[in-house]
Amino acid sequence: MVLTDSEIEFIRKELGRDPNPLEYGMLDVMFSEHCSYKSSRPVLGFFPTEGEGVIIGPGDDAGVVEVTDELAMAIGIESHNHPSAIEPYGGAGTGIGGILRDIISMGAMPIALLDSLRFGYLEDQKSRYLFEHVVKGISDYGNRVGVPTVAGEVEFDDNFQLNPLVNVMCAGLVRKDEIKRGIAPRPGDVFLLMGGRTGRDGIHGVTFASEELTSSSELEDRPAVQVGDPFTKKMVMEASFEIMEKIEVSGVKDLGGGGLTCCISELVAKCDNGARVNLEAIPLREEGMTPYEIMLSESQERMIFVLSPDRVDEAMEICRKYELPAAVIGEVTDTGRMIVESEGKVIADLPAKLLADPPVIEREAKKPDLPEGQVEVQHPLLTEALLKLLSSPNIASKRWVYRQYDHEVQIRTVVKPGDDAAVLRVDEKTGVALTVDCNSIHTKLDPYGGGAASVGEAIRNVVSMGAWPLCIVDCLNFGNPEKPEVFWQFRECVRGMADMAETFGTPVISGNVSFYNETEGVTVNPSPVVGVAGRLPLDSIKTMDFKAEGEKIIVIGDTKPELGASEYLRTVHGIVDGKPPETDLRAEFDAANSVRRIIERFGDKVTAIHDCSAGGIGVAVAEMAIKSGIGATIDTGKIPGSFSNIHEALFSESNGRYILTVTGSVEEIIQELEVPCAVIGTTGGGALKFDDVALDVSELYDAYHGVIEAYMST
């Protein structure tokens, strides 16, 4: 049980009595960090959540934002870190299942999945095992339910060796007049439970996710990992949409963490209503299940529909059509109480608000020691450094991952994995760019700046496709919030993210917090995973690859002597230290807005765009050459900024920078850019040249490809 002594005392005072064992179990689940957000809620208030086009913000199963006059997009993101550490294949697969149900609950058809994954270095056998089976779990589940996995990111670092991070984002489309909510507003309506049968898997899943892992977790906590079934999920999806199309439902919610206890209490508490639940009506997968097990089970592929009693027969007929178990398991009441009955007796009677809205905890925050200066190193040859960066699993091609995913099912994917963002077709004219990004090293060494920079990088990725950000979702992965240094990291990171979002006027419409990512005293690098959706006309998509020889290369944004916390230091020198790049909120916005303006004004004259992030300008230009097979000549002295040597010029990770190629006259474009910028080179030839240093594009290609494949074949 994760209830603290003070929480138990609070509960006794609210009830005027001691809870019985079932009630204790229900309260334990709902007071868990995973369900209650009791530590994070005060901090999450920093986020801007309202803005043009926002239909539903935080607080429901997913956020919803307007995309066209008729269509909206539901977007959510979730973590499945602890389950994936224990059972990587099943943990990752059920993570996909959970986020799909969140999108379906809004009435939206899922059209895209994205994943953000973090593991230990691939030299470690256990890390390779976790990586292999997490990717297979994602691909098997996503491919079988027919939802494309279109983009993502992967990071490898020692701090994720014992505690991998598995975050999944999903986007879906829904007509604006068909959006559903997770509410139960009408007393007298009934709860229709449909989908998978309820078993013993996943019991205590949310409390398991609200504690640190230990050396014995792999054995002791395996029953807390849910068991997914993608075939049943496919049937649940189809049946759900048919029910929502044919029957007026007043509320829809999936059964995820906390099972029936969480789902029903949240449905009714939002409307100040109550619920009566009959355990005998619930379709079970196993015999002899206790009320405690039934109410806390997190068995997968289950949905609750709130509807009028006179529409039950129609809904049941649809469920029979798809061979799905279904039953009316209770009703909405006006009592404000969550009542559970078994064999005609009341066995639990709790205020719904007490379950769904536990009190917050004001955590202590303490600033840890952080680096204040740059790290002095002896720089190797430029060619050696660039090739080593390109052959690092953190930068090298992720083709081993995305080739396992079906990214073209549904035939919406316009720009496929491997670019700055994926682009999907919404209608004949409109597309959405989707990305997910994070910089855990910057956040570890400067939480405020790293949080802001993670939002900035995600926005740069959609801007580089020709889109403008509509909304942000986030998945915040941190250690134990009871430790003051960890909570300070979390608070400062959220402040930085919120400030960057506010600068762009881009609302945060949904999110997830995953605490307790610690094992045996090793805390993960704080990882604020940021998903961004941007809208763009389908006829103005940009991609990163060079398009032709003889085009001018422009850099937007200043490059500074900021090698601290860089991929260059981590990969080439084995150092994770130094002050990360500064975050200039206004400069980040001005650079993005300048890119938007020149795309709008000059259109096809802008032939390629790529953001600068891990590895700096050197890696960014190399990736553009590798993607196209076209070389380039770069004059590093023309790069705008204040660096002191070529390694700083090429590998600093200063924020707010883009690389563009343009055709025709460049002067007019430069004049339009009211930010630091310069023409730094020209495309052409079979080599990438930085001043008098040259590398054949074929050599860059070979360094960049086959890296992860080589590790995974050992």
From Swiss-Prot:
UniProt keyword Ligase, yes or no: yes
Binding sites annotated in the UniProt record for substrate: 79-82, 101, 226, 298-300, 514
A cellular-component GO term for this protein: cytoplasm
Binding-site list for Mg(2+) 2: 102, 254
Family label: Belongs to the FGAMS family.
NCBIfam families linked to this entry: FGAM_synth_II, PRK01213.1
Protein name: Phosphoribosylformylglycinamidine synthase subunit PurL
UniProt source species: Methanothermobacter marburgensis (strain ATCC BAA-927 / DSM 2133 / JCM 14651 / NBRC 100331 / OCM 82 / Marburg)
Gene name of the encoded protein: purL
